[in-house]
């Protein structure tokens, strides 16, 4: 197997990507293609499932061709994907009966309120680890059944299949031969019992969703079956599946209980490995499955922040104080601190651990001496402060003191932000050499399943440090910063609560 590689497919919200990895975890080739975002009404977000498939199949073939290889050079394929996005298709024709309803879509918010009024919230959280929210797949499936003509009847006949994006890709790669998902994607549907590791009949009944629609749930690392499409001339084992944040946690080698990663993207996703036991959150975090390898289940706590790197886009597009995202570090570095200015970027409400949908963006501490540099500094600081709030909630829920924070995503390239994150956390922020941790995690899961890599210990030895940011800010200054942030958060909530 010396000349073989692992192909990772990373199907995201705005683009489909493919990457080839070698035995040392290095990227050999990559391909990417964006696809259309569909907004039929305010608050609705859809994708064309056929375009998801065609772009993903296209970049898979392109990545292999670019490397001068063919299918025989690929030892296995791993899939990672945007989570919760819901596709329902006809088993007989293989055609979707409606567009994919994307995780961001809010059309079922009123129905979620009805479920809460029926007293289901506590039961759903106890079984699935999730709150009732339109973010997750369950109410999206229900909407399709209720609003697409003939869907209920076809579902009763057993003709309809539901899947998250991973299931849809596997179905197409195997020409309808496999209807499967993995435990991580199942754990984001609001229908999967994370304790029994089975679809929950009580929740299916409450939501009036036929069990016959659902995929078989498998481990995150196992051989599901071979490809059967013309994308590759040879049959390649499909051998790893994980939702994007779960794959990133594994790609960061956060394999021990208490290890945490933060992905700094448009928003921020913080995930903590909690070992073999699910921890029920008392601090508005989500309990989820990190991954399953063999019979071993790892659980996780997750907190999502709505506005992370997006605050930099706002400085560029909304305020016009920078021309491109790369300028923010230079501008923010031109002052030694924010001079008492705090930005709470609640442009779409506050996410974990506050969960305040009515909160709006607020800027505090502004004086005549406030400059664009101070606002830029406050914007960067806000990403670190919000991450701190989630990490403190994780520590409170788990009883584990975080030893270090592993970082990835676009904004982790900003050294000023990473240093401030370490300063206010009081622990090191650690950036890996391979920034593509999501795709790498999918590759690792697939490679383990086919013996390309021996075990997790071998993978641990591959994790390479790019830079370690060590806390350097004096304790008194950290306290002053955090006191100011807490005042700003309280004021933002007060603004939201004032009619």
Swiss-Prot record:
<feature type="binding site">
    <location>
        <position position="83"/>
    </location>
    <ligand>
        <name>sn-glycerol 3-phosphate</name>
    </ligand>
</feature>
<feature type="binding site">
    <location>
        <position position="17"/>
    </location>
    <ligand>
        <name>ADP</name>
    </ligand>
</feature>
<dbReference type="GO" id="GO:0019563">
    <property type="term" value="P:glycerol catabolic process"/>
</dbReference>
<feature type="binding site">
    <location>
        <position position="84"/>
    </location>
    <ligand>
        <name>sn-glycerol 3-phosphate</name>
    </ligand>
</feature>
<keyword id="KW-0067">ATP-binding</keyword>
<dbReference type="GO" id="GO:0006071">
    <property type="term" value="P:glycerol metabolic process"/>
</dbReference>
<dbReference type="InterPro" id="IPR018485">
    <property type="entry name" value="FGGY_C"/>
</dbReference>
<feature type="binding site">
    <location>
        <position position="313"/>
    </location>
    <ligand>
        <name>ATP</name>
    </ligand>
</feature>
<feature type="binding site">
    <location>
        <position position="84"/>
    </location>
    <ligand>
        <name>glycerol</name>
    </ligand>
</feature>
<feature type="binding site">
    <location>
        <position position="244"/>
    </location>
    <ligand>
        <name>glycerol</name>
    </ligand>
</feature>
<keyword id="KW-0547">Nucleotide-binding</keyword>
<comment type="function">
    <text>Key enzyme in the regulation of glycerol uptake and metabolism. Catalyzes the phosphorylation of glycerol to yield sn-glycerol 3-phosphate.</text>
</comment>
<feature type="binding site">
    <location>
        <position position="245"/>
    </location>
    <ligand>
        <name>glycerol</name>
    </ligand>
</feature>
<feature type="binding site">
    <location>
        <position position="410"/>
    </location>
    <ligand>
        <name>ATP</name>
    </ligand>
</feature>
<feature type="binding site">
    <location>
        <position position="135"/>
    </location>
    <ligand>
        <name>glycerol</name>
    </ligand>
</feature>
<comment type="pathway">
    <text>Polyol metabolism; glycerol degradation via glycerol kinase pathway; sn-glycerol 3-phosphate from glycerol: step 1/1.</text>
</comment>
<feature type="binding site">
    <location>
        <position position="410"/>
    </location>
    <ligand>
        <name>ADP</name>
    </ligand>
</feature>
<feature type="binding site">
    <location>
        <position position="266"/>
    </location>
    <ligand>
        <name>ADP</name>
    </ligand>
</feature>
<dbReference type="InterPro" id="IPR005999">
    <property type="entry name" value="Glycerol_kin"/>
</dbReference>
<feature type="binding site">
    <location>
        <position position="13"/>
    </location>
    <ligand>
        <name>ADP</name>
    </ligand>
</feature>
<comment type="similarity">
    <text>Belongs to the FGGY kinase family.</text>
</comment>
<dbReference type="InterPro" id="IPR018484">
    <property type="entry name" value="FGGY_N"/>
</dbReference>
<dbReference type="GO" id="GO:0004370">
    <property type="term" value="F:glycerol kinase activity"/>
</dbReference>
<feature type="binding site">
    <location>
        <position position="309"/>
    </location>
    <ligand>
        <name>ATP</name>
    </ligand>
</feature>
<dbReference type="GO" id="GO:0005524">
    <property type="term" value="F:ATP binding"/>
</dbReference>
<dbReference type="Pfam" id="PF00370">
    <property type="entry name" value="FGGY_N"/>
</dbReference>
<feature type="binding site">
    <location>
        <position position="13"/>
    </location>
    <ligand>
        <name>ATP</name>
    </ligand>
</feature>
<dbReference type="InterPro" id="IPR018483">
    <property type="entry name" value="Carb_kinase_FGGY_CS"/>
</dbReference>
<dbReference type="InterPro" id="IPR043129">
    <property type="entry name" value="ATPase_NBD"/>
</dbReference>
<protein>
    <recommendedName>
        <fullName>Glycerol kinase</fullName>
        <ecNumber>2.7.1.30</ecNumber>
    </recommendedName>
</protein>
<keyword id="KW-0418">Kinase</keyword>
<keyword id="KW-0808">Transferase</keyword>
<feature type="binding site">
    <location>
        <position position="414"/>
    </location>
    <ligand>
        <name>ADP</name>
    </ligand>
</feature>
<feature type="binding site">
    <location>
        <position position="14"/>
    </location>
    <ligand>
        <name>ATP</name>
    </ligand>
</feature>
<feature type="binding site">
    <location>
        <position position="83"/>
    </location>
    <ligand>
        <name>glycerol</name>
    </ligand>
</feature>
<keyword id="KW-0319">Glycerol metabolism</keyword>
<dbReference type="InterPro" id="IPR000577">
    <property type="entry name" value="Carb_kinase_FGGY"/>
</dbReference>
<feature type="binding site">
    <location>
        <position position="135"/>
    </location>
    <ligand>
        <name>sn-glycerol 3-phosphate</name>
    </ligand>
</feature>
<dbReference type="GO" id="GO:0006072">
    <property type="term" value="P:glycerol-3-phosphate metabolic process"/>
</dbReference>
<dbReference type="Pfam" id="PF02782">
    <property type="entry name" value="FGGY_C"/>
</dbReference>
<feature type="binding site">
    <location>
        <position position="309"/>
    </location>
    <ligand>
        <name>ADP</name>
    </ligand>
</feature>
<feature type="binding site">
    <location>
        <position position="266"/>
    </location>
    <ligand>
        <name>ATP</name>
    </ligand>
</feature>
């Amino acid at each position: 197997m010396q000349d073989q590689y692992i192909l990772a497919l990373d199907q995201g919200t705005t683009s489909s990507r493919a990457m080839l990895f070698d035995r040392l975890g290095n990227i050999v080739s990559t391909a990417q293609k964006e696809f259309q975002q569909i907004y039929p009404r305010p608050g609705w977000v859809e994708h064309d499932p056929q375009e998801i498939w065609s772009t993903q199949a296209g970049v898979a073939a392109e990545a292999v061709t670019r490397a001068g290889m063919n299918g025989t050079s690929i030892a296995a394929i791993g899939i990672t994907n945007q989570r919760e996005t819901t596709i329902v298709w006809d088993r007989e024709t293989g055609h979707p009966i409606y567009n994919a309803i994307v995780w961001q879509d809010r059309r079922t918010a009123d129905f979620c309120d009805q479920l809460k009024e029926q007293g289901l919230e506590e039961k759903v959280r106890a079984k699935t680890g999730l709150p009732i929210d339109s973010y997750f797949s369950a109410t999206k499936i229900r909407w399709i059944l209720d609003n697409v003509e003939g869907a209920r009847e076809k579902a009763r006949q057993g003709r309809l299949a539901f899947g998250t994006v991973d299931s849809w890709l596997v179905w197409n790669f195997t020409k309808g031969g496999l209807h499967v998902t993995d435990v991580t994607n199942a754990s984001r549907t609001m229908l999967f019992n994370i304790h029994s590791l089975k679809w929950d009949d009580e929740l299916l009944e409450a939501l009036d969703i036929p069990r016959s629609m659902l995929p078989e749930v498998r481990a995150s690392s196992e051989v599901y079956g071979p490809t059967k499409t013309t994308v590759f001339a040879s049959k390649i084992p499909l051998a790893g599946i994980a939702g994007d944040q779960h794959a990133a946690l594994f790609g960061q080698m956060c394999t021990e209980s208490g290890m945490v990663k933060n992905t700094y993207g448009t928003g921020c996703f913080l995930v903590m490995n909690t070992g073999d036991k699910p921890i029920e959150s008392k601090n508005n975090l989500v309990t989820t499955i990190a991954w399953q390898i063999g019979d071993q289940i790892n659980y996780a706590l997750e907190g999502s922040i709505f506005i992370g790197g997006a605050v930099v886009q706002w400085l560029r597009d909304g305020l016009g104080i920078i021309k491109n995202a790369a300028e923010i570090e230079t501008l923010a570095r031109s002052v030694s601190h924010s001079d008492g200015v705090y930005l709470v970027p609640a442009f779409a409400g506050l996410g974990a651990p506050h969960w305040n949908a009515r909160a709006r963006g607020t800027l505090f501490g502004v004086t005549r001496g406030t400059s664009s540099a101070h606002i830029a500094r406050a914007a960067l600081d806000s990403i670190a402060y919000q991450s701190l709030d989630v990490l403190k909630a994780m520590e409170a829920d788990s009883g584990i003191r975080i030893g270090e924070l592993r970082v990835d995503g676009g904004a982790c390239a900003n050294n000023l932000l990473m240093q401030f994150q370490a300063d206010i956390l009081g622990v090191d922020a650690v950036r890996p050499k391979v920034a593509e941790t999501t795709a790498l995690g999918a590759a690792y899961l697939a490679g383990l399943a086919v013996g390309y890599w021996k075990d997790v210990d071998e993978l641990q030895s591959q994790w390479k440090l790019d830079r370690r940011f060590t806390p350097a800010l004096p304790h008194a200054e950290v306290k002053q910063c955090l006191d100011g942030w807490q005042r700003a958060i309280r004021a933002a909530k007060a603004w939201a609560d004032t009619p």
